[in-house]
Structure formats: structure tokens, C-alpha cells
Amino acid sequence: FQHITPTCHSLWRSLACVQDGVLSNRNTKTRGGISSAGTLTVRAGMLNNQQGFMVGQKDMTLNAGTLDNRQGVLGSQASLQISSGTLMNQKGALKAGTDMLLSGGDVSNQEGTLAAGRDLNAHLNVLENQQGTVVSNGNSRLDVTRFDNQGGRLVAQQSLTLSSTDIINDAGGLIQSGASLNLRADTLSNRNSGDRGGVISQGPMTLNAGTLDSTA
């Protein structure tokens, strides 16, 4: 991969970055990073935003084979759409002022934050959310092959739909909706919920699981 370090910082019109190799914006949280007052579109073989800062006031679209946002900040005041084969967001933050759409392969969100101001939709292979937070102020819909939420939080202020082959919600993990909750899984482990964890709905709950383990 060829490494390209962007020189743009504050842009008052739409910004598009296309790079077949590595687009690096790492270590920019304390010195500006990339910001756009318009839409922001990035396409790269790898986008490295580790400890970086990348924000837009309007819609943001990111397409990368690998996206590294460990301890970084990626955010849009409008919608945020990310397509990535591998997304690393450990202790990082992905935030959308309105809707968030995540699609692709594996997402590592240990101690990280995925937050949508409105609806959140995710179509993924694996979502690792140990001690992490996935939250929306609207509806959330997640279709993932494997969801590990040990000690993590998946919260929708409105309806929540979660479909997965394997859901691990142990060790105080929380899956919660403010309205209806629809959960489908081949295997659901909900052990050791404690006082703050478990599967909680403020509205109707539909639970379909081939195997359910909810021991204390």
C-alpha cells in the first residue's frame, strides 16, 4: 500500500478523497485533523484515523477495506455511512447527528462508541462490543452473524430489532429498547446480568432463540 497523508484541514465545500492505498489521518486529534462544512466522501484501501479527528457538518460516506479508528473520532452532524471489511474502533467514537448505516465484515468496538442521533442500521459479520456502547435516539436494526456484548450496551430509545446467529450478552451486558424489542438468535447467552444488565424492553418484546441460557 502507498501511504498518503492528507494536507487538507478545514474545507468550506464538499470534500472527496479517493486513494487505492492507505489514507492516513492518524494522531490529529490535538492538531486539527480533517473537517468539512459540506459533505465528506472518502474511499480508500485503508483509512487510518487512529487517534485522529475527522468530522463533517453534512453527510459523510466512508468506504474502506480497513478502517482504523482506535481512540479516534469520526463524526457527522448529519448522516454517517460506513462500508468496511474490517473496522477497528476500540476506545474510538463514531457519531452521526442523524442516521448511521454500517455495512461490511467485522467491527471491533471494545470500549468504543457507536452513536446515532436518529436511526441506526448495521449489517455485519461480527460485532465485538465488549464494554462498548451502541446507542440510537431513534430505531435500531442490527443484522449480524455474531454479536458479543459482554459488559456492553446496546440501547435504542425507540424500537430495536436484533438478528444474529450467536448473541453473547453476559457479564452485565445490556440490550434495551424504549419501544418494541424484536430479538432473534440461534443461541442467546444472557448470563450474570447483575443489577444493570439483561434484555429489557419498555414496549412489546418478541424473543425467538433456539438455545437460551439466562443463568445468574
Language-model segments: residues:
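A composition-driven surface/loop motif
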Residues: 1-216
